[in-house]
Amino acid sequence: MSGSKGFRTPDASDKPERGEVNLSLRTVQRMLPLVQRIVDDILACQKAVVQLQPQEASLDRQKRELAWPERARRYQIKEEMAQADISLQDALSELRDLGVVLLDSEQGRVGFPTLVNNRRAYFSWHPGEDGLHSWQFADEDVTRPIPLAWLKEISYSGKA
């Protein structure tokens, strides 16, 4: 890999074929800080909606009897929920634009598409992990640790 600027293998190219994105481990490691922030935004939006839904439901049931302050609060909650939904859709769109897949919306687990032995796979990460440690085949739920050999190839090819 002398002279190579990035980690490349035949199984993991940054160039999409047939519209599919295949990310190298090196690229995924560089993308991770941005994706972490996007996932944090997604989880915050979901939490906001979950917290506002009971208030909205309660005020909606009483909407004909509400005094102005409660009615104003009902409108405010609806606006906050709409804004949270817009922010959520924006964050999901950012992930899609990066080629990243949301594998578990409750946990915030994401998959970075790649190929392993010519099979569709994901490098996976979720909030709470201090870095990228696992991967899985796209058609399986079983996560596997990233082999040390893959990590060594990155360190041999330059700064990780």
Task: Show the residue positions of the predicted features.
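Charge-rich, acidic-biased intrinsically disordered regions
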Residues: P54-E80, V101-Y122
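Amphipathic coiled-coil alpha-helices
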Residues: I38-D41, C45-A48, L52-Q55, L59, ...
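Glycine-rich, aromatic-bearing surface loops/beta-hairpins
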Residues: Q89-A160
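Mixed-charge, polar/low-complexity N-terminal
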Residues: G3-S4, P10-S13, R18, L23-S24, ...
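Long, hydrophobic N-terminal alpha-helical segment
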Residues: M1-Q62
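Arginine residue identity/basic-tract feature
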Residues: R8, R18, R26, R30, ...
